[in-house]
Amino acid sequence: SMRILQTLALWPALAAYANPIRQVHISQQACFAQSRISAKDMGVAQLGCVIPAARLGSELIKALSECAAGKTAAKASLELFNPAQCQSISKTKQAWQVLFSTAENEKIVIYPRLVIAADGSDSSVRDLLNIALLTTSSQSAAALATSIDISTSHQHIAYQRFTPQGIIASLPLLSNKIGLVWTADQATINALKDLTELDFLDRLQQHFSYRFGQLVRCTKPRIYPLRSFIAQSQAQPGLVLLGNAAHTLLPIAAQGLNLALQDMSVLADIIANALKTATDLADPSLSQSYLDARLPVHQQIIGFTNHLAERFQSRFKPLTFIHNNGLLIMDLFSPCKRNLSRRLMGTHGRFSRLMRGLTLQQKEY
């Protein structure tokens, strides 16, 4: 993901807000085993980094606005409407007919050969086209998100803690803060939400002990309903669903953004190659090429995150024993660690040009 953003010249504006992750610590409460994955062991400077979502979004919009205004070196013809809402979409003989409205309630109709819908988990494009969803997790869950001031350095360590009360993940932020996501069943999350700040921090301190020293204060928790699904038709001639519109994951291993950026970069490769050969962007071979490249990766990542969520929360003692020893084996056996780290860093599947640091104008090698 970082290399994609670097290649797109977006990284310089984001770097000051990025905090590196140099180690990932995975453990299960009441089990002696644990696993650590470090950047040093993997031969990289960092395993990843944490950037505030609002900052990433604002920089992306800024880059699009500058491109639309002709202020970038890229020779692109871009018309930007932000915000905008898709009102209807239908297929004609020659193209798609898309009606959308702007913030000023202006109605605009366009006729593109290719529609790329990256409009989130509640995608209006997907719903208007009646594309069905396949639920990929049986869990009814919610997530509580907050940021916490800590009394000691987080040492750039991300924690994934599996407990009977849910899965707790912490990410290192700037200035002795951590970002925290607590995933659990709805009843547990509702109970956590009703706690006072002091009681909530005390509950969290019990789970994390004093790895962060004293938990000092937290922002008001935000609650999100969780879903895990994949669209049954992610691509068809002239249409591609991207990001959460195509697949929404449980936030277990922070793979949603990695997956979306990889999808985008592979699709960009396919479009760039089609433009070079004057291939119609609605040609069925393009959508099929995209599906062939990405569906296996989607299935692997969704299976991986759901497996972690469901298996580690099991209270069946033989399974707990297996997981406990599984963490120990992974900590001792380098190939297991390497495989997990590649998943966490998003370095699996087909490598697009952007993922390899090449622009779309450069030749593949």
Tell me the role of every PLM-derived stretch.
Residues 269-365:
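C-terminal helical "tail/cap" subdomain of flavin- and related membrane-associated enzymes
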